[in-house]
Amino acid sequence: FFSFSGLMLFFPLLLPVLVFDSIGSRTLLFKQERIGRNQKPFILIKFRTMLPGTPSIASHLSSASAVTSVGKILRRTKLDELPQLWNVLKGEMSLVGPRPCLTNQNELIQERETLGVYDIRPGITGLAQIQGIDMSNPQLLAEVDARMLTTLNLKNYFRYIFLTLMGKGLGDKINLN
């Protein structure tokens, strides 16, 4: 219900983003295999923020020059995440949970497996995101994800959503080299 409502609520934002995003990269949506609940892979959907052909690596390892001008705005405002509401509708993700990692982030996958993080669906936002922790420190990220799982209740669920909407957190870092 929340993801459908979110799609309807943010539809007026989605249309201009689709238009401007297509100008910057010619491809509107970005699809990538990620690790979901119980380590089951799924296809995550986002607005494209990087140039087509950019290697499929974690954002903190990507070059800043690979991010389109529109992509910088989408990342800063977190609007690039809106298409993931479709993943939520399909039951592959939740609004709140650990961010789904790439299939090649072996260290993070192992850390999360050890701490039981894969027991729940990944989310669009979570504790690590509002604290500004990205995937560049797999052990810290997995520990914060595990802590979120032990403290996740209805109040915190909506608190994380609210803080994300208010711009808390830095989003994924990119390599400035």
Stretch-by-stretch model annotation:
Residues 22-23, 76, 88, 133:
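Conserved catalytic core of Hanks-type protein kinase domains
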Residues 64-71, 152, 156:
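Alpha-helical membrane and juxtamembrane elements of multi-pass inner-membrane transport
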